[in-house]
Regions:
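Leucine-rich solenoid repeat scaffolds
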Residues: 169-220
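Feature marks extracellular polysaccharide-active and adherence modules
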Residues: 56, 63, 68, 74, ...
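Short, solvent-exposed linear patches
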Residues: 116, 143-144
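Acidic/polar low-complexity surface segments
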Residues: 97, 101, 116-130, 159, ...
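Primarily hydrophobic membrane-targeting regions of prokaryotic envelope proteins
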Residues: 1-2, 6-11, 17, 71, ...
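C-terminal region of N-terminal signal peptides and the immediate post-cleavage residues
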Residues: 2-3, 8-11, 19-42
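Hydrophobic alpha-helical membrane segments, chiefly transmembrane helices and signal peptide h-regions
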Residues: 13-26, 52, 72, 76, ...
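N-terminal segments that cap or nucleate solenoid repeat domains
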Residues: 33-82, 218-220
Length: 220
């Protein structure tokens, strides 16, 4: 297997690892690892890492990682997290794709906004992306490439707003935002989604209030 050369630039603040920026450098071939929703990895990271991490370009894949820090995904970049533990928040704005699979854990919140590609945070159905554990809130706002939030245990609130169906040749089941089979500790709020969200006949457990669109139903 050939490996993409990559650079991790680390800034030191007060003697601690502060920021790690992942940037792919051209190489003869990409890492031969396909990840659901994000395509082929251009940079793969495994093992322990301390400090905040920014996925700057290409597709960054975290496999069996324990990260003590937050993650930011830059516009146009993609991130896949599989079998990993993140002790911090995850924030994406304008990402090309985001995947969170196979019992991964996040110690903070997940915020995904204005993404142009598919967002897969666990699959509550029969897919290959098992849900994970998210201690904080989940916010999904103004994404246009398809969204699925399934089979997760979520400690905080879930807010799903202004997401629109992807255009061009997507499966029917991916046209609407899917929120299915989650256990949600906080509120579930949906608004302004086109079309309205579906639970794909796999209800969610919500320990607080449910409001907006289909999400307001006690059977959603």
């Amino acid at each position: 297997m050939t490996h993409v050369q990559h650079r991790i630039s680390i800034l030191l603040l007060a003697g601690a690892l502060a920021v790690a920026t992942i940037a792919a450098i051209p190489a003869t071939a990409a890492v031969a690892a396909d990840t659901p929703g994000t395509g082929t990895c251009t940079t793969t990271i495994t093992g322990p890492l301390t400090g905040a991490l920014t996925a700057a370009v290409g597709t960054t894949c975290l496999n069996n990682v324990v990260l003590h820090g937050a993650i930011t995904v830059n516009p146009g970049a993609a991130l896949s997290i599989v079998d990993s533990t993140i002790y911090g928040a995850i924030t994406t704005n304008g990402a090309s794709a985001f995947t969170f699979c196979n019992s991964s854990t996040v110690g903070g919140a997940i915020s995904v906004a204005t993404s142009t590609g598919f967002i897969l945070i666990g699959d509550g159905g029969e897919g290959t992306c098992a849900g994970g554990h998210i201690d904080g809130a989940v916010t999904l706002n103004a994404n246009s490439g398809g969204v699925e939030l399934g089979g997760n245990t979520i400690g905080g609130a879930v807010k799903v707003s202004a997401n629109v169906a992807p255009t061009g040749g997507v499966p029917v089941e991916d046209a609407a935002t899917e929120i299915e089979g989650n256990s949600i500790g906080g509120t579930l709020t949906c608004s302004g989604n086109t079309p309205v969200p579906t639970n794909d006949m796999t209800p969610n457990t919500v320990n607080s209030s449910r409001t907006g669109e289909t999400c307001a139903s006690s059977t959603f």
